[in-house]
């Protein structure tokens, strides 16, 4: 199956919204507020505005390099994709491998600078767990500001420039992918109703992806408490 780069991008956004902790009404309201902010900008300010924000609620998910019409059949995926990984992709292509798109989970470039913007989603997650929204916003405001400042001195375009010079289509998908995992685990726990912490660990260890991680010593572990303790309410974050 072959898809255009833009089709893949829009598909990821749609799947992210379908499995978002927020309702579609809440997401639509966010996009409407963004449109209002845009319309209030001066003509000069609009020159520098990221128009993707009007239709994509995930600032950490972007097409970073490549034409939207580029046809994709084979994708090289990675959690963290940086310059060395793009050079590897280019080398594999030289050796005859077919790679139409390099896809990263963690954001790069403009999407990395947008990471702090999607952290407001955590406020909604906490609110759904019973935390008053005012308290949730207060708890997260310092952390969001800290993350935003942390990336300001970064050379965020280095990896993007590499992809452009190598003529490699490059995309990152962060929050939409996280939403899928959160949705899956929340439904798993709701269906299986684990009673103890050990039950939770056992459920996770039956998931193929976690089993693969366990083989390299990176599987689920308990970092606080005892396996015999009751779970009570489970929050997936």
What are the functions of these language-model segments?
Residues 1-237:
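Hydrophobic structural segments
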């Amino acid at each position: 199956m072959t898809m255009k780069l833009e089709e893949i991008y829009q598909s990821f956004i749609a799947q992210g919204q379908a499995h978002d902790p927020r309702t579609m009404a809440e997401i639509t309201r966010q996009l409407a507020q963004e449109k209002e902010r845009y319309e209030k900008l001066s003509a000069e300010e609009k020159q520098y505005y990221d128009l993707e924000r009007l239709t994509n609620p995930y600032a950490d998910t972007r097409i970073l390099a490549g034409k939207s019409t580029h046809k994709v059949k084979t994708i090289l995926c990675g959690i963290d994709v940086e310059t060395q990984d793009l050079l590897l992709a280019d080398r594999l292509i030289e050796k005859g491998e077919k790679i139409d798109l390099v896809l990263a989970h963690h954001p790069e470039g403009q999407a990395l600078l947008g990471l702090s913007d999607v952290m407001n989603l955590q406020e909604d997650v906490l609110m759904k767990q019973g935390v008053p929204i005012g308290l949730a916003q207060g708890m997260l405001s310092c952390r969001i500001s800290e993350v935003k400042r942390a990336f300001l001195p970064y050379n965020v375009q280095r990896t993007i420039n590499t992809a452009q010079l190598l003529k490699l289509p490059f995309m990152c998908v962060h929050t939409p992918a996280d939403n899928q995992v959160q949705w899956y685990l929340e439904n798993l726990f709701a269906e299986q109703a684990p009673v103890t912490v050990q039950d939770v660990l056992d459920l996770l260890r039956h998931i193929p992806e976690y089993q693969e991680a366990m083989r390299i010593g990176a599987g689920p572990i308990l970092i606080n408490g005892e396996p015999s303790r009751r779970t009570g309410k489970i929050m997936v974050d």
